[in-house]
Amino acid sequence: MKKIIAFIILIFSFNSNALELKPLLEFLNENDAKDPSIREYLSKRCAASNLAMTRFIGKEQEGYEIAFNNYLTWFLIAGEMRKVKFPEQDEEVAGKNIASSILNMTDEMEKILQNSQDLRGSIFEGNNILTDITLCTQIIESVGK
């Protein structure tokens, strides 16, 4: 009986780790950044991290407008990457799919931010979201040069 309980606990621990967001830098190091699918995912992750920040800090706070504009920029880039990947796909269908993915990621990131705030006193303590946002900002800045 003890072996069965230990096995069940082990399975649940694997499942809980399987659904966590991989740090974006780690993801990019493991994948080909020239692949439109990878670029679309990167764009959706960057959009989601910025949207999560807008939800967390609120409209009246400093930084909201920057985060919201970054979200919109990354959303549009994700759409462009989708066009490269699936040129024949209906734009409305593509937009809905991209938006759905971004919202799913945003919901997870918002939970991570809240959990970090509750357990550590800082929204960025114990997670990779600030590192992801910084990476996204560096990418946008390097493209703009």
Show the residue positions of the predicted features.
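Short N-proximal segments of mature Sec-exported proteins
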Residues: 32-88
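Compact alpha-helical subdomains of small soluble proteins
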Residues: 75-145
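Sec-dependent signal peptide recognition
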Residues: 2-7
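Residue-level signal for mature regions of secreted extracellular proteins and peptides
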Residues: 9-11, 39, 129
